[in-house]
Each structure stands twice: as C-alpha cells, then as structure tokens.
Amino acid sequence: EVALQVFADKGFYGTSMNEVAEAAGVTKPVLYQHFTSKEALYRELVDELGTRLERAIVEGVADADGPRQQVEAGFHAYFRWATREGPAFRVLFAEHNRADPVLATAIEKVESAVADRVAGFIEVEGLSDDERQVLAYGVVGLAESTSRHWLGLGLGPGTGADAFAAQVAQLAWSGLRGVRR
C-alpha cells in the first residue's frame, strides 16, 4: 500500500526506490531483497491492482439476474472501485504509462484479464469469440475513459457516481443490444 501511494502521487518515473523504502520505513537494501528493481515492484503492484479490480467487477455482477443487470452492475462496480481506490486507478490507468512499452505491457495484461471477464458476459447470438472479445475491449475502454474523466473532474463517491455509472451502463447496454450477427 505504501508503494501504491508513492507511485500514485509521483508516477513511475518520478518515484525512486529510496522514496518507497523511506515511506515504508525500511532501508533500500531491504526493499531490494523483495524486488529486484523499481520496474519489478511496479509490475507486481499493477498485477495486484488488476486482480483487485477484476475481483470487484466479478463480485459486483455476481447477483445480477440477467445480461442488462450484469452490464449495470459491472459499471457500478467499476465506478465504485475507481472512486474508492483512486490511487490504484491512477497507477493502473495514468495516460503517461501508455507511452512506455514496459509499463504499457503490464497495464495491457490487466486490461486483457478484465476484457476476458467482460467477454464472458456478452451474449449475442452468432457472435464469434473474437468478436465478443473486441466488444469486451470496447466496454472496458468505455469504463476506463469515463472513469478517468469523472475522477479528473474531482468527483467521487456521493457526487452522483451511481447515477453516472447508470448512464454509462445504459450507453453500453444500448450499444451492445444494437449488435447483430
């Protein structure tokens, strides 16, 4: 959690292992006993955050009765996670991370895992697995970009996030219902 906060505040390139060690209350050699490099620490952190996001979505849709409810519950879970876990969201989806091939690869792994989950919820008769996967990436992109904008406005829990998530879910649902094979 300490590394998460430091990376969220300063970004990957603005963060040093000295700062992480100091914030954690350990020496740099102790930190290097656990992580071979700043990149290794960051990758492990991104993997853990991706697992948390995926878990939040899966748990969020677990009690949904049908496809439309799954879409809405999924967006609500995503928005709740993004607003509750602001530093984690910033580490995962900071736009500058995409410019670096190493960081982008770690983040693409998270997006792929989430898209795989979302693809399993898309039920369109006659749609191939590849087509379902492409649509899932569209849904993930919609969630990520709208959440980033929402958080960029300084909005969060209690400021209409649930209503906004419902609107984005409606947008996604309407789009998915328009898909025909």
What positions do the PLM features span?
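Short, charged helix-capping/linker segments at alpha-helix termini
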Residues: 13-14, 126-130
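Short amphipathic alpha-helical elements of helix-turn-helix/winged-helix folds
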Residues: 2-6, 81, 142
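Short secondary-structure transition hinges
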Residues: 73, 80-119, 123-127, 148-152, ...
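Alpha-helical DNA-contacting segments of helix-turn-helix folds
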Residues: 40-49, 56, 106-107
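Amphipathic alpha-helical packing segments from all-alpha helical-bundle domains
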Residues: 51-54, 101-126, 133-138, 145, ...
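Helix-turn-helix
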Residues: 2, 6-40, 44
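Hydrophobic alpha-helical connector segments
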Residues: 44, 58-87, 124, 135-139, ...
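Short alpha-helical scaffolding segments that buttress acidic/His motifs in well-ordered protein cores
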Residues: 78, 92-93, 139, 172
